[in-house]
Amino acid sequence: MSPTTPRSVEPSGLKPEQLPPSYFTWPGLLGRLGNGQELSEAQVRWAMNEIMEGNATDAQIAAFAFGIRVRGITAAELAAAAETMTSFATPVDFSDVPNCVDIVGTGGDGHHTVNISTMASFVVSAAGVPVVKHGNRAASSKCGGADMLEALGLDIERSPEDIRQDAHDTGFAFMFAKTYHPAMRFAGPVRSQLGAPTIFNLLGPMTNPAYPKFGLIGCAFKEFMPIMGGAFARQGSRVLVVRGMDGMDEISVCTPTEVVTVDAAGRTGEEVINPRNVGLDFYEDGSLVGGDAEYNADVAVRLMKGEISGAIKDAVLINAAGALTAVRGWEENGFQETLREQVQIAREALESGAALKQMEKIVGKEF
């Protein structure tokens, strides 16, 4: 756990003890935000430490979390906040699970879809790539990834030892954010009271305690896509940060999808995904709408059994392909060609029945 007094050296070259007394105080920090100034990484770490240790008041948490988002967070600030928050998480060692990937989004897109990323996770793991999914219950929709997995029969509150074993046995592990980020209990009530996106929406996808090096990251907020990409680059991750032009925090099959790519060398780029360019199709808005946990779980079972085609199937395939592209890399063959190849790999995993068997193995029962 990080100390309350930051040890980092400021850009000016001054050490913390040489800085003004107000530098590491809420009035000083919030004053900088109010004036439109950037915070140093040390100030962000100090603020996150205060929040995670339970030393900050609700008013201070709200002012920081909402204020830094409204002012416009930088990649350096976001990376510092993510690093500090993850240092308070329950640690899990996945160093012996190579090439694991997370498929996760910020939420808050208002589309209330079926659980695309969770279904895509079954397909990805069936294709031989381990998934360490970091998720939670629904916040603004009827059913989050944790809700659907629980409805399928998975015990979501599993110990670090259990999920390590899950990853080895099945190629899939689910880390329930509420369990693995206990310090977030200090910020949770404020987030609920605000009812508006804050820095914590961006931090959720960046604070997987397993530290996966690869990810398909949905971002519902267009203006923060390059910021998240820059922060992931600082973490040394290879990811795709995606947002459908319909606002969906997934790769959409209702519109093209904008992508910020972060490659293995930390270079960022931009792409656009068109489903028709990878052998899939476009569908009407609303064709991915889901329901409660039982409904979405039933959709997952029917999809894996081959009883569902069309929009939901294509959405799962293209998002699974996005995650596989992040793991396998696009530097050699180009992004679009790599994605097209991975769609076919995802299709084989789903249509062969391998994804159904994988889901049954993960939840421990047959459907």
Curated annotation (Swiss-Prot):
What GO molecular functions are on record for this protein? Answer: anthranilate phosphoribosyltransferase activity; magnesium ion binding
One GO CC term, this protein: cytosol
Q: Which cofactor does it need?
A: Mg(2+)
Protein residues bound to Mg(2+) 2: D249, E250
Q: How is the cofactor bound?
A: Binds 2 magnesium ions per monomer.
InterPro entries per record: Anthranilate_Pribosyl_Tfrase, Glycosyl_Trfase_fam3, Glycosyl_Trfase_fam3_N_dom, Glycosyl_Trfase_fam3_N_dom_sf, Nuc_phospho_transferase
Tell me the residue numbers annotated for binding 5-phospho-alpha-D-ribose 1-diphosphate: 105, 108-109, 113, 115-118, 133-141, 145
Any single biological process term in GO: L-tryptophan biosynthetic process
Binding site residues for anthranilate 1: G105, N136
Q: Give, as in the UniProt entry, the pathway in which the protein acts.
A: Amino-acid biosynthesis; L-tryptophan biosynthesis; L-tryptophan from chorismate: step 2/5
Q: What does this protein do?
A: Catalyzes the transfer of the phosphoribosyl group of 5-phosphorylribose-1-pyrophosphate (PRPP) to anthranilate to yield N-(5'-phosphoribosyl)-anthranilate (PRA).
Family statement: Belongs to the anthranilate phosphoribosyltransferase family.
Q: Which HAMAP family match?
A: TrpD
What protein is this chain from?
Anthranilate phosphoribosyltransferase
Which organism is the protein's source? Corynebacterium jeikeium (strain K411)
